[in-house]
Amino acid sequence: MKKMKKMKNKKLKILLSAPRGFCAGVERAIEIVEKSIQKYGVPVYVRHEIVHNKYVVDDLKNKGAIFVEELEEIKDKSRPVIFSAHGVPKKIPEDAKNYNMTYVDATCPLVSKVHREAENLSKAGYHIVLIGHQNHPEVIGTMGQLPLSSIDLIQNEDEAKKYINKNNKKIAFVTQTTLSIDDTKNIIKILKEKFPDIKEPLKEDICYATTNRQMAVKNIAKNCDIFFIIGSRNSSNSVRLVEVAKKSGCKNALLLNSLSKIPYEKIANSNTIGISSGASAPEILVKNFINELKKRFTISIDEVETIKEDVVFKIPKKLN
């Protein structure tokens, strides 16, 4: 009790990064699941986690969604299935049609844009290089838009340096939407030096929300003794935010996915802490974290907004 009282006397400044949390693609995907439940009743099936956040997935499970990894797992094929925000290989909607299943595609429109780019460039005679992380569902979905012989994956600078254009075709690159901006720039620089004629997207593929959240974290990281990113371990954009905070001047940056894992001793040795959240993390998780801190410290909060966001994506007409 004395220790708690002593901590309560400790003053702590919170720099709250903005924008943070849900992006338009995530909000759209969650709304698609909720509207599908309203329209079709329960259960509705969702192929893969709709977004990479346990809180969101558990909430939708409670509302009547059942999550599977493959269509074969769905015993009652008369029930609708929703494809996650990360996108799916082209084969998946075809399989759903063969099963006579009703499906709703919750792929983020910005991921769908990358799919179209890859397809159009391939049709125009280009061999495609995808910059991204192997086994991430978005990467699996993008690579699945084309025959495997038409697309290669590059994950880092080392792979970019070693990459050989075996097809002797003209090449073009596209990227995963949730990458580190700075790391991706370095990979692109290497590819452009090796292949001066490489074709790039008309507009960069890293999405507005990824860019804005990384800029916002970068803006305040150097002023923080410790930085917390609220998000799940399998959330690519959340993990990238931790990396950005570390590279931008706050070596003590951590991913927090559970209130039971708050490192109070580390916080007690800090004066200023930064807080942001990944694009799939709901704001309630940030509020819950701050409320836990209020129980133990005397805190002041300064929200630092780097850029305003007003992007909204429409849901499919069939759900209106």
Q: Residue locations for each model-derived region?
A:
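The feature marks the mature, well-folded catalytic cores of soluble enzymes
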Residues: 2-273, 277, 283-320
